[in-house]
């Protein structure tokens, strides 16, 4: 299977997000990379599902709370940017303060 660097990045994000999902389901608090992967993958899937950029940006602030992550993680993530594939093309999505 031949994948572009972008496709490899997407698979890596998905794999890390799947691990984060499983750990969260077991009641573990997510660390920095897990929180980033969890939110990023959810944003990419929301875009793929046909949500608008504004809807995806808002959705990104509802995925995790401070109780879901280790101490200090929310302060380490002032914003998340991801290039997501929407029905009308690829767009840059920025979510400010994704963990309120």
From Swiss-Prot:
Molecular function GO terms recorded: nickel cation binding; urease activity
Record's keyword annotation contains Transport: no
Catalytic activity from the UniProt record: urea + 2 H2O + H(+) = hydrogencarbonate + 2 NH4(+)
Assigned GO CC terms: cytoplasm
Subcellular location per the Swiss-Prot or TrEMBL entry: Cytoplasm
First-level EC class: hydrolase
Top-level lineage group: Bacteria
Pfam family, one: Urease_gamma
Primary location class: cytoplasm
GO annotation terms (biological process): urea catabolic process
Keywords: Cytoplasm, Hydrolase
EC number: 3.5.1.5
InterPro entries: Urease_gamma, Urease_gamma/gamma-beta_su, Urease_gamma_sf, Urease_subunit
Pathway given in the UniProt record: Nitrogen metabolism; urea degradation; CO(2) and NH(3) from urea (urease route): step 1/1
Keyword Hydrolase included in the entry's annotation: yes
Protein family according to the UniProt entry: Belongs to the urease gamma subunit family.
HAMAP family: Urease_gamma
Self-association and partners: Heterotrimer of UreA (gamma), UreB (beta) and UreC (alpha) subunits. Three heterotrimers associate to form the active enzyme.
PANTHER family named in the record: UREASE (PTHR33569:SF1)
Protein's name in the database: Urease subunit gamma
Gene assigned in the entry: ureA
